Amino acid sequence: NDGDRFIIYISCEDEHLQLFKKELADYSAEIICIAYKYNLFNDSVSAQGLSVQERELLLSAIIAADFEDDKRFVKSRIQFDTKIAVDGLFNFRLQSILKKWEEISTYIPQHFTREELKEFIGYLISEKRGRKVYIKDDAVYDGQYRKMERSNLLPKGYENKLLKEVLLSGAGEIFISGSINKSEYGRLSDFFGDKIFISRG
């Protein structure tokens, strides 16, 4: 910990270096496109009319809306040899995406109803209709059965973690097997409805 900065040192074998750099670039892009984007919209979107938990869902949905495009752009701007400073990358090489997010924030209504929130999330789901995610024992997996943990980049202490994880995955359809918390299932069905499929096996 260096003041407000956290520094992580990682070593790997030379033969794994290129793969490691690729993974590091991928995760650095996710930090920016989720955590940094959340901070910007959290400061600029009041979303009056929604509860605290509903507002958090709205912010997650806003992040998810352009997540893949944002991530591709951020990764295209990442250049490093053996060190990468995420804050420096954002502050000096990503001003264009910051301006894009700031412009988007000006178009978001400052008052939302719960029905409008459902409509907005429903629109996102329809746009992602071909993308499948899998839920097993309250964990979310992508189409390659890799565990999704993007919601860990959001502030802790709020409900709807499973629903936010599904939103951040860009899911259009959900396949559930194993056990799932009833209240979490209720929240999922509230937004995804007939896009949820349950395995009885």
Task: Name these PLM-found stretches.
Residues 144-201:
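C-terminal structured domains
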Residues 1-160, 164-166:
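Conserved mixed alpha/beta catalytic, RNA-binding, or beta-rich assembly cores of soluble enzyme
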